[in-house]
Amino acid sequence: MSTKRLFSLILAVAMLAAIVAGCTNQNGAPISSPPAEETAAPVQSEQPTQSEEPQQVSATGKGTLTFARTESIATLNPHMYTSDIESCCIEYTGAALYGYFYNDDKSGVSLRACIADGEPIKMNDNGTVWQIKISPDARWANGEAITADDFMYSFKMLLDPKLVNGRGGAFAEDYIKILNAKAYYTQTEAEGAVPTWEDVGIKKVDDMTIEITTSIAQDATEVMSHLAYAWTVPVYEEMYESLMNSDRTATTYGTDIDKVVCSGAFTYNAWERDAEISFKKNPEYIKQDMIQIEKLVMKIIPDRGTQLQMFEAGELDYVELNSSQFKDYEEDPRVLYSPSIYVKYMPVNVNNPDNPILSDVNFRKALFLAVDRESIAKLHPRPR
């Protein structure tokens, strides 16, 4: 288990506030689960004075936020990403049906509609059929409307048994279990027959409405949470198809910034592999009035010590510290506690053929009874 907690030194709090809620999930992170609980982190001692009158937000934004990450980026395809940094890039540039946004007083975040036009509508008494309407204001970065067809195509490709997209299994079953989705994705029998796409519980009702049928009863929050993940961000059909190979087993969608169409808060500006990726504000984003910053610059710096040196030299606007580095900054007036990644729970892969003992429930109980809970609890940083 990783016991490392992340702490942040933040010099540009006002700029960061506009985007931090967009990447509080965790899929290695991310990014698209609910935001992590508060951990420690640092800020400039004086924050900008807030005007009593609301300020007009520019369609292009103002200012640049420069920060660093340790990982490299392999793909920008929401169906195939594997790392936290890839999830964050997709969440910066893609809009899902639902997402986590600041509440009115910015004291926390809440799960709200993004591209969706309101909460899911329960269509039967037992909570297995849900309709989601798409906002008429939802747009791709190229100005085209986002419709039900975009989500139908995206979800079909995500579950496509020939593409075998890495995120298809989680989309089939996570917060909710979509009817026949897993059996279609894995091409295994469901009630005696391998289902076709038409058997999967995802249907188009009209141009701006989709309907999802689940195999068990679900509630609205579960449906919204499931449809807030980064892998549910829509892909642009025309480009996705144009980049498909001849036997339809792979697409190069998302392998470069000119091979993806954005729908989120930012669009891709430039990408120098293993060095830097930058983003610029998307004026077509449905919630663009919430985004105050013009540009993000994410540098790839594997060594955290180097990141800290760059921060102190003024080359980065904030830096994340591991627990050992934090000891030197614990009393620094710039320290601020902010939402960050943390260990929620440890799942056990009960289906791993290389470790069949993990399928034994009594072994798993013994495993967790052996965990030293007191030592783990002591690792939590003291409250400030």
Predicted regions located by residue number:
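Extracytoplasmic/periplasmic ligand-capture domains
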Residues: 3-6, 18, 22, 128, ...
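Hydrophobic core
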Residues: 11, 15-19
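Bacterial lipoprotein signal-peptidase II cleavage site
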Residues: 23-33
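N-terminal low-complexity, Pro/Thr/Ser-rich intrinsically disordered segments
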Residues: 40-65
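N-terminal lobe/hinge region of extracytoplasmic solute-binding protein
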Residues: 68-125, 261-262
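A structural "hinge/loop" feature
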Residues: 69-91, 115-116, 166, 221-234, ...
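Gly/Pro-rich hinge or "lid" segments in bacterial periplasmic/extracellular proteins
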Residues: 102-103, 197-198, 216-218, 225-291, ...
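Surface-exposed binding/hinge segments that line
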Residues: 166-242
